[in-house]
Swiss-Prot record:
Database matches in InterPro entries: ATP-grasp, ATP_grasp_subdomain_1, CarbamoylP_synth_lsu, CarbamoylP_synth_lsu_oligo, CarbamoylP_synth_lsu_oligo_sf, CbamoylP_synth_lsu-like_ATP-bd, CbamoylP_synth_lsu_CPSase_dom, MGS-like_dom
Family, as annotated: Belongs to the CarB family.
Protein role: Large subunit of the glutamine-dependent carbamoyl phosphate synthetase (CPSase). CPSase catalyzes the formation of carbamoyl phosphate from the ammonia moiety of glutamine, carbonate, and phosphate donated by ATP, constituting the first step of 2 biosynthetic pathways, one leading to arginine and/or urea and the other to pyrimidine nucleotides.
NCBIfam families in the cross-refs: CPSaseII_lrg, PRK05294.1, PRK12815.1
Organism listed in the record: Enterococcus faecalis (strain ATCC 700802 / V583)
Binding site residues for Mg(2+) 4: E832, N834
Protein name as catalogued: Carbamoyl phosphate synthase large chain
């Protein structure tokens, strides 16, 4: 059926900020969909609150609204734009839930807006646990025995009837939020209570556990003519019981017989047809390893994390085609853009193995609960492609950037057998490494299979890797064994360790013996038809399919997996850099390992290498392509860390040179540069031991900020108040040494702000100054940022601009740089300089209209800023006020303290813009999911040193009609100042109503909790209070500056009511 002509204007809903369970895959899907609709001639309106995405760039849609995805704001935009139709299936769970809410509010009927893609009834049938169960019964598709419950007691009664273990799955939540596996009644009560609270419809499905079955996924597409195909099927390495987003996954499936494959394929197609979904859909199934019995676990009636993986694994652009299906096109009418000859109804075939490994944030949250279950915890993922499982898996392991170049972690050699067994049975994020260690110790794969229920086939592949290790050890310098190791994904570094040689020696020996990788094309059809996609992976075979062009090329290094501290902002900068390289007439080549992002869409660059970002893998591409140089400024710390080793290999780094990068990162050189430029910085020094740190701190005075050198996202950074805490930090948080010194700085309390600048060696363009709402001490990525500055005097702004210019020219910066300042007692100090793109680039680019990464790339390639139409100094400010607010994923990460400090904890960001600061703040809070009631109770639990300041805030809350509740010390203090306050007891002293009861019973609408600097039981109480607030979805502020910002909003919305 040809595309519809009765609709002209379509609204697309994005997925909002990046959180665990909903990451960059929706930026990729949404960008593809908007462009596909524009290609077909429709007018596109986009609503998304996330400024860090390519999707919210002006050119992606005809009308781009960076506004909160809430009923209030989306309704307003619908009334203003009057679209004919709405496409919600590309905005993840956020988009689906918003569509349901809009429909229930009646506005879609009122404005006559049609829902495209998937009907509401289908969303309901797939998402509402009860309706889904009924549909499966009608289709005679088996589902685990289960019951829908609305209370904890109903859940307990069902469990008593069918026995434990059982699984709790809340309705309409994302990434398994609030769900979990229960072995006892006590666990069930706790998880069911939490799950019912987090489900927007207070409904959970309690089902018999089928943990241990094989977990299989099918990614399917259907059109309005009822054509349906399987794009890709995938098999989880981990059996049922671990969320698929936290599982290692292989595509295509590896252990299914043809009969099993066809049986599950038929079931998946039957389901998508019954739901009448038009577009993409993901079906998850559980297969009994000992029979042909299977169960349908769940269906996602939308584009998902798995469809991004399936798109990158096959090259088949699911989101693009789903958008076109939504407007009436059919699979047999659309060409597959990969081959350009076959039609989209042709099922992709793979002649390689794809593996995906999740990337977890536990390097940031050492105290976080690492056990994996049905609730997702990974922030991102990596993908690798190889000719066999071993090669694919080992390439994925080294893509993770966790310091592992092979499936082993050195520290596991000290673990006892008992501990090893425990960690394999109760899976954590590092189970793969424990399994490998067990095989090295001589456990049989049959033993491991009975402990973990992982298929013998996969365990045998791990065994094969370890057999090759043994062969390498006993055959040093043997070319045949070396070749076998390389064909199975071994890194030069691992072989070097086994042969007692250097990595360079192995690389030289390998090249001397003609053992070099070739690059194969990802073509969706297993080479059955000719195809010309510029999308490649490496393998050790004979024929190379990547032809080097005559045109000079530039290699851009991507930023790898999404993790805390290095998010989608860096992918945004990478994509823009590529556009500028192409515009300058060069061939742009991207290397990256993240399947979720826009940068790894093969249509973005001239050539895409889907490879790990390690020195060996990058050098292999450089050896083949011979680019004029490499750009490292846009790939975060991942790319910057490769600058020095690449330079040593004779590779040209474009932009700021490695010597100048080092002057910004190396403490002594940086101090020297600042002294020469006469720019002040907080007093401090470098310590190579704990004793030295104490001496420095005594000299400059407490509090001090301590951190290791060369970090991103403030890893292991702390503010320390006294000598005992400093010794404690030096012992536990860092291993100081002459090679890895620790920086000890005087901690200056003051207003913090930051600047992004672009320099071409002569002119310094400063797009804007961003002022942080939280004082120095909260990581810049976790602070709310305001542009243009609201409280900085013209004089201070001039000083900041002057220092920025001096630094950019003094450090010979070419390209981007980011500088953070603190204003202490009316003096400007430099805290740090990052000679690369920072996470604020997309935010500032959107509001100033300067495509910063493109302009910086042009400067890197030798163009002058004045020729591009830019002047020296600060760019004129915009009329509106823009607020960038962080978004956290604490509900998914148990046992993590939500207190904000110098170590970054947020996973995403939103933006609020308006002509008044208060309105922009309101939008930012709304967009970040903090919905503020206009009345209710505020719970205060305040550390002694901030009580005076908190008093002012309490007075203002009281003045606009809030009641005050506080823990003992705080309540006495407020009462002494004549404020009406209700006192509650501490946790450690449970007489009467405790502070936790107040939160649990819904008697606090806002919680303000500051941390006592001298760590005692007060802090343990504080931790419990903060966790309780997060788990009950109550707005929590750990900084009085943020509370002050909230008050501004509430006061601006409050009216005075007084009797005459």
């Amino acid at each position: 059926m040809p595309k519809r002509t009765d609709i002209k204007k379509i609204m697309v809903i994005g997925s909002g900020p990046i959180i665990i369970g909903q990451a960059a895959e929706f930026d990729y899907a949404g960008t593809q969909a908007c462009l596909a609709l524009k290609e077909e001639g429709y007018e596109v309106v986009l609503v998304n609150s996330n400024p860090a995405t390519i999707m919210t760039d002006k050119e992606i849609a005809d009308h781009v609204y960076i506004e909160p995805i809430t009923l209030e704001f989306v309704s307003r935009i619908l009334r203003k734009e009057r679209p004919d139709a709405l496409l919600p299936t590309l905005g993840g769970q956020t988009g689906l839930n918003m569509a349901m809410e809009l429909s229930e509010s009646g506005i879609l009927d009122e404005l006559n807006v049609e829902l495209l893609g998937t009907k509401l009834s289908a969303i309901d049938q797939a998402e509402d646990r009860d309706l889904f169960k009924q549909l499966m019964e009608e289709l005679e598709q088996p589902i685990p025995e289960s019951e829908i419950v609305n209370t904890v007691e109903q859940a307990v009664a069902f469990a008593k009837r069918i026995g434990y273990p059982i699984i709790v799955r809340p309705a309409f939540t994302l990434g398994g939020t609030g769900g979990g596996m229960c072995d006892t009644e006590e666990e069930l009560r706790q998880i069911a209570e939490n799950g019912l609270k987090l489900s927007p419809v207070t409904q959970c499905l309690i089902e018999k556990s089928i943990a241990g079955f094989k977990e299989i996924e099918y990614e399917v597409m259907r059109d309005s003519a009822d054509n349906a195909i399987v794009v890709c099927n995938m098999e989880n390495f981990d059996p049922v019981g671990i969320h698929t987003g936290d599982s290692i996954v292989f595509a295509p499936s590896q252990t299914l017989s043809d009969y099993e494959y066809q049986m599950l394929r038929d079931a998946s197609l039957k389901i998508i047809r019954a739901l009448k979904i038009e577009g993409g859909c993901n079906v998850q199934l559980a297969l009994d390893p000992h029979s042909f019995n299977y169960y349908v676990i769940e269906v996602n009636p939308r584009v998902s994390r798995s469809s991004a993986l399936a798109s990158k694994a096959t090259g088949y652009p699911i989101a693009k085609l789903a958008a076109k299906i939504a407007v009436g096109l059919t699979l047999d009418e659309m060409k597959n853009p990969v081959t350009g000859t076959t039609y989209a109804e042709f099922e992709p075939a793979l002649d390689y193995v794809v593996s995906k490994i999740p990337r977890w944030p536990f390097d940031k949250f050492e105290k976080g609960a690492r056990e994996l279950g049905t609730q997702m915890k990974a922030t991102g993922e990596v993908m690798a492609i190889g000719r066999n499982i071993e090669e694919s898996l080992l390439k994925a392991v080294r893509s993770l950037e966790i310091g592992a170049y092979h499936n082993e972690l050195a520290e596991l050699s000290h673990v006892s057998d008992l501990e090893l067994t425990k960690k394999m049975v109760h899976a954590q994020d590092d189970r793969l490494f424990y399994l490998s260690e067990a095989i090295r110790r001589g456990y049989s794969i049959e033993e491991l299979q009975s402990l973990t229920k992982i298929d013998l086939f996969f365990l045998d592949k791990l065994l094969h890797i370890i057999e090759i290790e043994t062969a390498l050890e006993s055959h040093v310098d043997n070319v045949a064994v070396l070749k076998e190791a390389k064909q199975n994904g071994f890194s030069d570094r691992k072989i070097a360790a086994l042969w007692g040689q250097t990595e360079q020696a192995i690389a030289d020996f390998r090249r001397a013996n003609q053992i070099v990788p070739v690059y194969k094309m990802v073509d969706t059809c297993a080479a059955e038809f000719e195809s010309h996609t510029p999308y490649f992976y490496s393998t050790y075979e004979v024929e190379n399919e990547s032809n080097v062009s005559k045109k000079p090329s530039v290699l851009v290094l991507g930023s790898g997996p999404i993790r805390i501290g290095q998010g989608v902002e860096f992918d945004y900068a990478t994509v823009h850099s590529v556009k500028a390289i192409q515009a300058a007439g060069y061939e742009a080549i991207i290397m990256n390992s993240n399947p979720e992002t826009v940068s790894t869409d093969f249509s973005v660059s001239d050539k895409l290498y889907f490879e790990p970002l390690t020195l060996e893998d990058v050098m292999n591409v450089i050896d083949l392509e011979n680019p004029i140089g490499v750009i490292v400024q846009f790939g975060g710390q991942t790319a910057i860390n490769l600058a020095e080793p690449l330079t040593k290999q004779g590779v040209k780094i474009l932009g700021t040179t490695i010597e100048d990068l080092d002057r910004a990162e190396n403490r002594d050189l940086f101090e020297q540069a600042l002294q020469e430029l006469a720019i002040p910085q907080p007093p401090g020094d470098t310590a190579t031991s704990a004793e030295e740190a104490v001496v420095i701190a005594d000299r400059i005075g407490y509090p001090v900020l301590v951190r290791p050198s060369y970090v991103l996202g403030g890893r292991a950074m702390e503010i320390v108040e006294n000598q005992k805490d400093l010794e404690d930090y030096m012992r536990h948080a860092v291993k100081a040494s002459p090679e890895h010194p620790v920086l000890v700085d005087s901690y200056l309390l003051g207003q913090e702000c930051e600047v992004d600048a672009i320099c071409d060696g002569e002119t310094v363009l400063i797009p804007g100054i961003m002022e942080h709402i939280e004082r120095a001490g909260v990581h810049s990525g976790d602070s709310m940022a305001v542009y243009p500055p609201q409280y900085l005097s013209q004089e201070i702004q001039a000083t900041i601009a002057d220092y920025t210019k001096k630094l950019a020219l003094g450090l010979n910066c070419v390209g981007m740089m980011n500088i953070q300042f603190v204003i202490h007692e009316n003096r400007v100090y430099v805290i740090e300089v990052n000679p690369r793109a920072s996470r604020t680039v997309p935010f500032l680019s959107k509001i100033t209209g300067i495509p910063m990464a493109q302009v910086a790339t042009k400067a890197i390639l030798g163009e002058k800023l004045t020729d591009l139409g830019y002047q020296d100094g600060l760019y004129p400010e915009s009329k509106q006020v823009h607020v960038k607010a962080p978004v956290f994923s604490f509900t998914k990460l148990q046992k993590v303290d939500t207190y904000l400090g110098p170590e970054m904890k947020s996973t995403g960001e939103v933006m609020g813009s308006d002509y008044y600061l208060e309105k922009a703040l309101y939008k930012a809070f709304e967009a970040s999911g903090l919905h503020l009631p206009s009345y209710g109770a505020v719970l205060f639990t305040i550390a002694d040193e901030t009580k005076e300041e908190a008093l002012e805030i309490a007075k203002r809350f009281s003045a606009i009609g809030y009641s005050l509740v506080a823990t003992e010390g705080t309540a006495d203090f407020l009462a002494k100042h004549q404020l009406p306050v209700k006192k509650v007891t501490k946790i450690s002293n449970p007489e009467g109503e405790t502070v936790l009861d107040v939160i649990r019973n819904g008697n606090a609408q806002v919680v303000i909790s500051t941390m006592d600097k001298n760590r005692s039981s007060a802090n343990q109480d504080g931790f419990s209070i903060r966790r309780e607030a997060v788990e009950h979805g109550i707005p929590l502020f750990t900084s009085l500056d943020t509370a002050n910002a909230i008050l501004k909003v509430l006061e601006s919305r409050a009216f005075t009511t007084e009797a005459i």
